[in-house]
Amino acid sequence: MATVLVAAYGKWVRDQVRTALAASDTTVLEVTRGQDVRGAVAEFGPELVILDMQIANMGGVAVAIDLHLEAGAGRVPESKILLLLDREHDRFLAKRADADAVLVKPIDAGTLRRTMKQLLAAAPSASTADAAPAQA
């Protein structure tokens, strides 16, 4: 069973992700503030962290960078990172944050499930940043 942490300010985003992953053998945890992500990753060790670009006080890009730095220093376990972008042009920011994959909102449930499976099946050092096609 995989553990997925979803960080998004908007309840509709968290609900959309939870609904998309409901049929899979996945535990979905939620936080609404960017500053809470690091603690949740340290406590629960999720295999995948799904970050919305809009997280109350700390956006998805900043959280992704923080998680990479903390994992590199050995303070939190490594997790795959999926960024949920607001628009196609945000791919530039996602690359700067070294996200493992990106999806452009609105999220298609099937695409989200496939992307999650690809990320969880990938070797830890393999980058799949362009594995998930963007949604129009």
Q: What label would you give each PLM region?
A:
Residues T32-L48:
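Acidic, metal-coordinating helix/loop segments flanking the phosphotransfer/catalytic sites
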Residues V49, V102-L103:
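Two-component signal transduction core modules
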Residues M1-W12, V17-R18, V49:
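Conserved acidic segment of CheY-like receiver
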Residues L51-L69:
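Conserved phosphotransfer microenvironments
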Residues A62, L83-V102:
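Alpha4 helix (beta4-alpha4-beta5 surface) of REC/receiver domains from two-component response regulators
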Residues I107-M116:
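C-terminal output helix
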Residues E47, G72-K80:
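His-Asp phosphorelay/catalytic-motif detector in bacterial-type signaling
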Residues K117-A134:
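The C-terminal output helix
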